[in-house]
Design a protein with these regions (language model features):
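N-terminal beta-alpha "docking/capping" segments at the starts of catalytic domains
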Residues: 1-50
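Broad gene-expression machinery/nucleic-acid interaction feature
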Residues: 30, 83-87, 138, 152
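Catalytic micro-motifs at enzyme active sites that drive phosphoryl/nucleotidyl and oxygen chemistry
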Residues: 18-20, 75-78, 151
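Helical lid/core segments from catalytic subdomains that handle acyl or acyl-like groups
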Residues: 92-149
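Small-residue-rich loop/turn and linker elements
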Residues: 69-101
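Acyl-group handling in specialized metabolite and lipid biosynthesis
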Residues: 31, 40-47, 95-110, 156-157
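A short, aromatic/hydrophobic, helix- or strand-capping loop or linear motif
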Residues: 68-75, 124-130
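Acyl activation and transfer enzymes in specialized metabolism, enriched
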Residues: 40-65, 155-171, 175
Length: 175
């Protein structure tokens, strides 16, 4: 069971923003941007490990280190989860795709092992479940062919995050 803290929205420093955005039909956020992944790519080649899993680890660390990214609005209450888990899409062996994810851990070896195991399981066949959007999950899509802005992938937040800065947990937001 995921652990979380309930935020008292009446005394919350972000009450005015919460009141404003909670009136939106879909008050979610997202961002997309080219990221310099040279360091992760070099590490993956040197260690003969999966670039996808390695980048997912770095990204998951950043998502968990930013308290605002762990906020969720569930059943009329704002929750800050202790940890959030990555959700991602994998290509199946038959050419289809499958949604999968695993429990987050800061331990790299354990994270890598969990991700690798889930990817292998979900590559074999499409598994269905009742809910793919657990409250303690963040969904990620890493598409290497998307470049710049597009009408389809228009972000709410635009970020320029070189991987070296991303590891340091900076998220500059512009226009």
């Amino acid at each position: 069971m995921a652990k979380f803290e309930i935020i008292d929205t009446n005394t919350w420093i972000r009450k005015s923003q919460f009141d404003f955005f909670s009136t939106f039909l879909n008050p979610d956020y997202g961002f997309n941007k080219k990221i310099d992944v040279t360091t992760v790519l070099e590490y993956s080649k040197e260690t003969k490990t999966s670039f996808f899993i390695n980048f997912l680890y770095v990204f998951s660390l950043a998502m968990n280190d930013i308290p605002e990214m762990r906020l969720r609005y569930v059943n009329g209450e704002v929750r800050r989860y202790d940890l959030i888990n990555p959700g991602y899409t994998v290509k199946t062996n038959d050419g289809s795709f499958n949604n999968c994810g695993h429990e987050f851990t800061r331990n790299y070896q354990e994270f890598y092992s969990r991700a690798h195991e889930q990817i292998e399981i979900h590559k074999e066949k499409v598994l269905t479940r009742e809910n793919y959007n657990d409250n303690d999950r963040f969904l990620t899509m890493m598409v290497p062919i998307c470049e710049g802005d597009s009408a389809i992938l228009k972000p709410v937040f635009k970020t320029d995050i070189p991987i070296s800065e991303f590891i340091k947990k900076f998220i500059p937001v512009k226009e």
